[in-house]
Amino acid sequence: MFDLVVRTAGAEDLMAVLGVHARRDPGGEVPRSASGLERQTWDRVVRSDELTVYLAEADGDPVGTATMMVMPNVTYACAPTAFVEAVVVAAEHRRQGIAGAMLRQLLADARSAGCNKVQLLSHKRHASDGAHRLYSSLGFEPEAEGFRLYLQQAPASAQSARADG
């Protein structure tokens, strides 16, 4: 077994988070540097009071990440709503309790923030890989149908600018 730590990512953790995202697929290539756009975006993320990025480390190795946004709300007696995005575990570390540990911490933080509800969208392709079972085991219910509209392609600069450093 390994020593698992789930913590809030800080300014110094950009490369760790990018590395986990790169390793979500077997054989994913970990970037050597972040692009200017990635650094600017990360700076905005870590400075935001509404966003929390979680970083899971197994024996000090970054192996998982998830993001929670707490949105103020004038409904539900002004209780905020939490949104979960980008739950990722490195391919070689899946099915070891890492996503569950991150989500349990995230849910505890959402409760502490007084959130009325936590919303999580999961792609249909994850119905067969265990992710939906995990979410259900943590109390999430498939009670709504989500819709998504992509307004633009991801900026090419996020990928190509990495080479420019």
Walk through the language-model features, giving the residues of each.
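Conserved beta-strand in the GNAT
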Residues: L55, D61-V70, F83, V88
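A short helix-loop-beta-strand connector motif used in the catalytic cores of GNAT acetyltransferases and
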Residues: D43-L55, F83
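Conserved active-site alpha-helix within GNAT-family acetyltransferase domains
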Residues: G100, S112, N116, H123-E145, ...
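A conserved beta-turn-beta hairpin within the catalytic core of GNAT-like acetyltransferases
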Residues: N73-V84, R94, E143
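A short beta-loop-alpha structural element at the N-terminal edge
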Residues: L4-G19
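Conserved acetyl-CoA-binding loop-helix of GNAT-fold acetyltransferases
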Residues: A86-V89, R95-A108, R133, S137
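Conserved GNAT-fold acetyl-CoA-binding loop/helix
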Residues: G19-W42
